[in-house]
């Protein structure tokens, strides 16, 4: 039973809360709360025997500050996170408390998961993982060349050989914005 903590109106809900899980045949627990409290979420995990959980790192930071020992989280089998950088101490604390490794991912409203720590991988805290095989990912430096190991750059998706499944078509009624982000066979994520 999968729980993603994301407002259903948010882009994350499309692939991380509804469609991705439906395609995989998973059971989905949809819970939209007006105000987040760690005790509320931990209670839902316990009472409904949630097995798979995906909130952003900020939620994990709040969960580990709560007295988790008051809750039976033994149903949890798999936990992922996305939306911001995961702090190493949050990763380690959550793992120590639950025994579960947090698997990170990166995607945008414009894309599905583009980088991730996939189930067959050992997570490396601080790393978003590896490119999703459905995307031709590159890291471009400010001068437009592919970054070398250790260099910083912008995550881009090459589309010169075709548009991958999951990549948006265009920004609604904003052709200039679309052209700024996606031109010459490359989609620039801005990240």
Language-model regions: role of each:
Residues 117, 129, 148-151, 169-170:
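Active-site glycine/GP-rich loop and adjacent strand/helix microenvironment
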Residues 156-191:
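Conserved ATP-binding/catalytic segment of the ANL
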Residues 56-57, 161:
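Beta->alpha turn/N-cap motifs
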